[in-house]
Amino acid sequence: DEDPADLVFYLRNENEANEDEPGSRYELRREYWTYALPIIQKAHGEDGSFSNVNPSRDNWINGFFGIGGFYLCCVANFDAARAEVVFGRGNKQENKAAFDSLYTHKTEIESALGTTLQWNRGDDIKSSKVFIQLNNVRIENETDWLQMANFHADWTKKFYDVIVPYITVDWQ
């Protein structure tokens, strides 16, 4: 017989969705990235920034370009999608210096891309980022997935082609 004093009980918050539960936001995200990742990987090529990336339960996936702490990021939210270049090293000053260096080329970069970008130095946080956002799409709406995946693929590839060369000059 088991001694009741040896029993362990685990409590679970009924208000929190189980990440493996069908219909949870985690399952939805993994399904979206499973759909989108091949499109993103194809845009970047066989050995590209996203070649070693797997579907995730998070609302983001990162692609890398060979400079530690700096990366491309695809974000899929319930109200928008974003493509980002992130300066996310552990050293805040290095992130700000890299961002500031890139910002000196803002006009050239935006001219080459044919659009204005969002430049977020993030003075109150460690990281900095440059991004573009696609509004009026929702990860929960599967009919938006192709548009979102193409947006992620196209813009992270454009960022890789246009922005990353400016970063590699100073931070390789």
Residue ranges with predicted function:
Residues 1-23:
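Mixed-charge intrinsically disordered linker/loop segments at interdomain junctions
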Residues 2-5, 26, 30, 34, ...:
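Low-complexity, intrinsically disordered regions enriched in charged/polar residues
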Residues 2-6, 82-96, 149-166:
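Hydrophobic transmembrane alpha-helix bundles
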Residues 9, 35-38, 139, 169:
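Hydrophobic transmembrane signal anchors and adjacent membrane-proximal interface regions, especially
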Residues 14-15, 37-38, 70, 150, ...:
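Short linear sequence elements within intrinsically disordered, low-complexity coil regions
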Residues 18-136:
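Polyanion-binding interface signature
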Residues 101-113, 136-172:
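Ampiphathic alpha-helical segments that act as solvent-exposed interaction surfaces
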